[in-house]
């Protein structure tokens, strides 16, 4: 089924879920009944007035053409070329002459750096060729990485369905390799969360984390090596995963610290999924568990490109707070996090994405100037995060509606093709 074939009511429902709104919340903002929203989403009531569609689009922060299933015009700064990635994912014929493995590894490494520096336009152009090459090389490790990069970019560009396809391909290629499967599960969880499928994301993320983390990282097994979280953590390991563990026999296996970083990332993604399900207590427990894993990492080679560590945990805590509606706590945590030394070491993509989330938190508390500062800071760190992502565009639109618009936002609105 193409986008044009999807009933308008289902598109309304999909965007409502993406905006983390219940039917009652949408009804309240439209000043209509919950029953009216339910009938629209089920197709029991026809949306045949453009003025009503415009009103819905305004509340859902999308263009009316999106709800109508019509082709959107591409605003300035938006990355195009996704069709080339779609075509590469649709290929089932194997290229006859893939590059040597060393050359492919170099290309994959370059693609990761391009993503982490938020050069999304460049990455869109690189990915079709990289996918074709990786699909012909039969290197599971490199193909999983190529699919993960692709999925991460597609989720950024609001192509979550296609992102999920790429993540699912990564999972299939990983096969029985627990570490590769765990890295692929990160992308699966991200794509499902972007689709509003938080329960499914949680179901995929937690088993994957448990397969790569030692039993001592779970709160039910604290007798092995102490209490994680904000209390006493196990003794730090070195980069080989070695350390003084007292010879305890309750571990699943200490493994490599790179695997622990993958497991910690899975826990953070699971915490965000739990928050999306409304399970705030579980989200806090999962972030505490991830904090314990992070505290046990002295330093590691981030081969799997997770950016996991204590600062990543604090970023997740802020987002969990925002998701449960406590924007004030989210902003307090953000203020503390950006003063930590590790903040500047996070990739530009990571920091830019967080600042967009921070801008949304400022909007929740009615601080338009704070939201504007966060957007301008994000643009200075990772311009494509602000200028290419549909999510950022909706935040800019919300801030730009102020009269007069805060400093810097009018310029951003113009850059992304918005008019006040």
Model regions: which residues?
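Short coil turns linking two alpha-helices in DNA-binding domains
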Residues: 22, 33-36, 49, 63
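Short, charged recognition helix plus adjacent turn
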Residues: 69-97
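DNA major-groove recognition helix of helix-turn-helix/homeodomain DNA-binding modules
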Residues: 31, 51-66
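Conserved hydrophobic/aromatic packing and binding residues within compact polymer-binding modules
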Residues: 12, 23-27, 37-40, 67
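Recognition helix of helix-turn-helix/homeodomain-like DNA-binding domains
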Residues: 31-47, 69-73
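Conserved binding/catalytic microenvironments
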Residues: 97-100, 104-108, 112-420
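Short C-terminal boundary/hinge segments that cap the last helix of small helical domains
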Residues: 61-76, 313
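A short, Lys/Arg-rich alpha-helix, primarily the initiator
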Residues: 1-19
